[in-house]
A protein has these predicted regions:
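Active-site neighborhood of glycoside hydrolase catalytic domains
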Residues: 68-90, 97-176
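A signal for specific C-terminal beta-sheet/loop modules enriched in small/flexible residues
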Residues: 44-46, 95-100
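N-terminal catalytic cores of secreted or lumenal carbohydrate-active enzymes
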Residues: 1-89, 109, 115, 119-123
């Protein structure tokens, strides 16, 4: 995490909060499964200083001037987790990118997600030699998944970085 809004180089990045409970829990799970777990990380919000609302809760959007820094943040997160011997299989661009929640959330249109992937996240993964990490788009309800995926995947410059589409089963008839 980076709380310093002047740290666009992410020099103060720290996993201190994660080391309190999340990382020990993941390490226990990996140990019990002989390291045979695929772990996908999904951000719920950029730091408040990177967002239009100035807070992590209640939606808001990633500020244009922080798109490159946010893409590098993903890579820093992956690198730090791997230094903890926690290999990340993949990442999603954003948990529930169309949900304005009272908790950590950030809004992306399909076009914003597409452009972030092709212009920032994909190139940052390449720059940090992390292109083997799977990138999952959408990561939200299944009801508009196809429409949403079509927007991103119809652009070859974005699609080349995308492994697949993630979805939640929160809506509709659960027994179809």
């Amino acid at each position: 995490h980076v709380e310093d809004e002047n740290d666009s180089e992410l020099k103060s990045f720290s996993l201190k909060r994660n080391k309190e409970s999340l990382i020990p829990m993941i390490k226990d799970a990996l140990k019990k499964r002989n390291n045979k777990i695929r772990i996908m990380a999904s951000p719920w919000s950029p730091p408040a200083w990177m967002k239009t609302t100035g807070e992590m809760n209640f939606g808001g959007k990633l500020k244009d001037e922080h798109r490159e820094t946010w893409a590098d943040y993903y890579c820093k997160f992956i690198e730090h987790y791997e230094e903890e011997n926690i290999p990340l299989w993949g990442i999603s661009v954003q948990n529930e990118p169309e949900a304005k929640q009272t908790w950590d959330s950030c809004l992306y249109t399909a076009e914003e997600e597409r452009d972030f992937i092709k212009n920032y996240l994909g190139p940052s993964l390449e720059k940090h030699n992390l292109i083997n990490k799977k990138v999952i788009i959408w990561d939200h309800n299944r009801d508009i998944m196809v429409k949403r995926a079509r927007t991103v995947l119809s652009d070859p410059d974005a699609a080349k970085y995308v492994w697949g589409t993630g979805f939640h089963w929160y809506c509709g008839n659960h027994f179809e």
